[in-house]
């Protein structure tokens, strides 16, 4: 079919293709990235929930995260993660990590080594 001297196919080909916009990543995604790096990328994120938090002077969110470490190497990385988390200096733009605590740890050895870790992180808006 011709439209003003061009076929319909030619008309479709001449349309400008715009690149996809990057999805905006929020503090929760940046926190998961930081936790994954601290876990040496051996952790599987099972659950992540976020609750708004506020005081008279600060606002932010409390994050609850569950991670699994499967296999001997992953469990070793998990043990290091548990030891380092409370004192770790996070660098998340626009956020201050006020608290990072391990709330539970569960080890199993059979049928394969596995470690389940629950953490809570309080992030405050840095504005």
Model regions and ranges:
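Long, contiguous binding/interaction regions
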Residues: 1-64, 68-127
């Amino acid at each position: 079919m011709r439209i003003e001297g061009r076929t319909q196919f030619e008309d479709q080909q001449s349309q400008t293709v715009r690149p996809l916009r990057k999805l905006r990543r929020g503090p929760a995604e940046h926190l998961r990235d930081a936790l994954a790096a601290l876990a040496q990328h051996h952790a599987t994120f099972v659950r992540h929930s976020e609750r708004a938090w506020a005081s008279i002077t600060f606002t932010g969110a409390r994050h609850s995260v569950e991670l699994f470490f499967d296999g001997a190497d992953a469990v070793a990385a998990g043990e290091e993660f548990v030891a380092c988390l409370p004192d770790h200096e996070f660098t998340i733009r626009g956020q201050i990590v006020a608290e990072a605590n391990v709330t539970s740890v569960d080890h199993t050895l059979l049928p394969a080594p596995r470690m389940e870790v629950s953490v809570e992180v309080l992030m405050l808006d840095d504005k």
